[in-house]
Amino acid sequence: MEGLLAKKFVVAMMMHETNTFSPLPTPIESFARGGGLGALNGPDAIKEAEGTNTSLGGFIEVARKAGAEFTVPMAASAHPSGLVTKAAYEQMTTAIVDEVRKGCDAVLLALHGAMVAEHYDDGEGELLNRIRKIAPDVPIAVALDFHTQMTDAMVNGATIMTGYRTYPHIDMADTARRAGRTLIRTLTGEVQPMMVWGNRPIMSSSLVHTPSREPMKTLMGMANQAEDTGEVLNASVFGGFPQADIPHLALSSVIVCDKRTAEGEVLLNRILDTAWEKREGFLFHPEPLSVQVRRAKGYTDYPVVMADHGDNTAS
């Protein structure tokens, strides 16, 4: 990653997992006091994020190791809640777009993938579209949450995309590093990333999204093996976020290929066809509460927490 001293990066974070069924809107104040980092910028954002297990922290590490000059015009993250207000969305996106407009060699974005604003169903796709209009040739690397709702606008706007491999999520910084490695190889001319993507009409409960269990274990295993062995540059599977009532809710996959997409398309179809074959496994059948309580009483060696999954306790 060394030797890119002349490069300037724009690094930013804009993350929200929007529950469209929630009656509570999400204003900019929610990002300021929300989960993770607040709506910060500049040195304050770098100070808060650097060295943390966040996608923004991972991207800052990538920029530092590359020896690049970089700015952080926006670092915003809020807990899952209702629609992001128009004012909040415009404030965050304007800060990022205005910084890109000043000129840069690459953009590194820590996004969620399931942001819904009052005026846009696809918050991330709209941001990427705005950036592309002013920087059509600048490579854009995006790190995404596993519960992304993938769209054409997102894929068309980005150069590289990677998603979390874990749920509960513990690999946020590493997801950014994976995208960052491909970005650096792109800037040095070693690779020429091209993406293919697709989805299947599966609206699955996030309670069956854990990659250590089937059916997600098989799908994630296929993607991870292809990336880790160099068959493709990056491969990600996204479970979608079922608490969002939007047209593009689905299980999806994005494959980042080098120069040609033939191998990636084969892998993509294999992953998605397998998901469809295993679709019954994405149904969640909860135990009756009485059974759960009785089972919990049997655990005497440690405390037991019975949580309402509607509060996103697994994230």
Residue ranges and their predicted role:
Residues 2-6, 64-68, 72, 98-107, ...:
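Glycine-rich phosphate/diphosphate-binding loops that line cofactor/substrate pockets in enzymes
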Residues 2-65:
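N-terminal amphipathic/basic leader segments beginning at the initiator methionine
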Residues 4, 10, 14-17, 21, ...:
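Active-site histidine-anchored catalytic micro-motif
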Residues 39-41, 72-81, 110-112, 271-278:
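Gly-rich Lys/Arg/Thr-decorated short loops/hinges at beta-loop-alpha junctions or inter-strand turns
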Residues 60-97:
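Low-complexity, highly charged intrinsically disordered N-terminal segments
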Residues 64-68, 101-102, 133-136, 163-166, ...:
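Generic secondary-structure signature for well-ordered alpha-helical cores
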Residues 176, 180-224:
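Conserved anion/nucleotide-ligand pocket segment
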Residues 207-315:
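Hard-cation-handling environments
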